[in-house]
Amino acid sequence: MKKNTIILVGALIAIAFMTYMLLSINTRKTEQVLLNTTPVIKEKGVEARSDIWGKEYPRQYDTWKKTKDSNKIEDMVEKYPQLAILWAGYGFAKDYNAPRGHFNALQSNINTLRTGAPTGPNDGPMPMACWSCKSSDVPRIMERDGELQYFTGKWARMGSEIVNPIGCADCHNSQTSQLEISRPYLKRGLEASGRKLEDLTFQDMRSLACAQCHSEYYFKKTPYTDEAGNKQVAAVVTFPWAKGLAAENMEEYYNEYGFKDWTHGISKTPMLKAQHPGYEIFTTGIHFKRGLSCADCHMPYTQEGSVKFSDHQIQDPLNNIANSCLTCHRQSEEEFKQIVEEKLKRKDQLNVIAMNSLANAHLLAKKAWEVGATEAEMEKPINTIRSAQWLWDYSIASHGSFFHAPGETLRLLGVANNKAMQARLELQNILANHGVTDYEVPDFSTKEKAQKLAGVPFDKLVKEKMRFKKGMVVEWYDEAVKAGRLDKNWWKILPDNTAYPQN
């Protein structure tokens, strides 16, 4: 009897195990069938709503939603008050924060003091182009209206249309789900640099999907005639890659083009503002030269059951060292962190030195103008300041440059500081020629002091922004929900952090 019981129990266990294995195999077969079947997200056009994509790609969607977790605000002007001096007369002197996750991109764009407080669709300081890297609605509108039409007019014109943050449609085709370049200006930039679009590989695309936004650009005024026969001018995002992707190549391009982003509010220098040349500086680093892509480190593959997929919580790889870094590097996590921290310390040290040199140069130039320096006297130091600040800005504007290309980053900071020091010496000589030998620049050691010197009416800007957020922005989202462009529960999950008090 006991022997029969043992046999029966053993048989039941074996049957249960075989049943489990059969179900597991069938489940994995079902998963593989689903994986090998590419869904059509939208028959025609661009599906900008990532939650619609999430119905077919739940794993990718769930990890993408985690990008909202990086919602902490780091006020870079508070951290580095020199920035208000360096960008005097330009929007970044008002407000500049460290980057956050893609989920937060659209709200950051609306909240920043740089975009102002429009009272209607045709006013405000910024053009339509300032939405271009913030929303998956951008390729939808470009396809529907045309690229030139999209780039025409003020930023506030499309507030109720551009309501979905960076998401699936920015990088993937809505019919095939394949990686694609959704911004035509990147295609033009690649062709200008000598790349053939037909030669791009899948591995290329795993970086170029990012390069659509993480690149240097300027707004090129482009005249055209609309369908109604009216003359229009579009401010088209343009990549200055015709002479190459290096900082000096772009500087040469801008100089030949006679381009300036703005005239400096303190030194009167015709300035260049680097945007976020992450891709360009990445191409000078060891990871790119070894064949790695952005996605290899920022979107490492992960496993769920039999399904292998890219983690769409795009973030600092140091938050996921085991999957992002230690697949190639052989250090422990702690040792690897220490190596990266050393690289960052070196960059930070040179960065502060360069910023201080540049801030002093701008303030010395202001004094030189005040005591009667001529344009002929000022031409050389002003041009030196322009070049120095461009190289400095290019080296740090993408934030991750110290890791992507540490050698190039340190080189650029060194050259920038050297040029800034040259400008300071030239300006000291000019001041001496005008009888000023003991001038000390004013204190810019805090955000408040630096913004005052830069002429930033901070409290006024915040008051205007809050009026805008409580009025026009609410109207934008209400209209978007009614039109079906946005889920009505959006407000419940949307982080709304700012570097300024929201009273």
UniProtKB/Swiss-Prot annotation:
InterPro entries: Cyt_c552, Cyt_c_NO2Rdtase_formate-dep, Multihaem_cyt_sf
Pathway given in the UniProt record: Nitrogen metabolism; nitrate reduction (assimilation)
Organism: Maridesulfovibrio salexigens (strain ATCC 14822 / DSM 2638 / NCIMB 8403 / VKM B-1763)
MF terms (GO), sorted A to Z: calcium ion binding; heme binding; nitrite reductase (cytochrome, ammonia-forming) activity
Stored CDD domains: NrfA-like
Annotated positions binding heme c 3: 102, 210, 213-214
Catalytic activity from the UniProt record: 6 Fe(III)-[cytochrome c] + NH4(+) + 2 H2O = 6 Fe(II)-[cytochrome c] + nitrite + 8 H(+)
Protein name stated in the entry: Cytochrome c-552
Residues that hold substrate according to the record: 217, 276
GO cellular component: outer membrane-bounded periplasmic space
Binding-site list for heme: 130, 133-134
Signal peptide: 1-16
Disulphide connectivity of cysteines: none
Listed EC numbers: 1.7.2.2
PROSITE patterns hit by this protein: MULTIHEME_CYTC
Cofactor(s) essential for the protein: Ca(2+); heme c
UniProt similarity note: Belongs to the cytochrome c-552 family.
Cofactor note: Binds 1 Ca(2+) ion per monomer.
Residues that bind Ca(2+): 216-217, 273, 275
Cell compartment(s), UniProt: Periplasm
Top-level taxonomy: Bacteria, Pseudomonadati, Thermodesulfobacteriota, Desulfovibrionia, Desulfovibrionales
Task performed by this protein: Catalyzes the reduction of nitrite to ammonia, consuming six electrons in the process.
Keyword annotations from UniProtKB, A to Z: Calcium, Electron transport, Heme, Iron, Metal-binding, Oxidoreductase, Periplasm, Signal, Transport
Pfam families per UniProt: Cytochrom_C552
Residues annotated for heme c 4 binding in this entry: 294, 297-298, 404
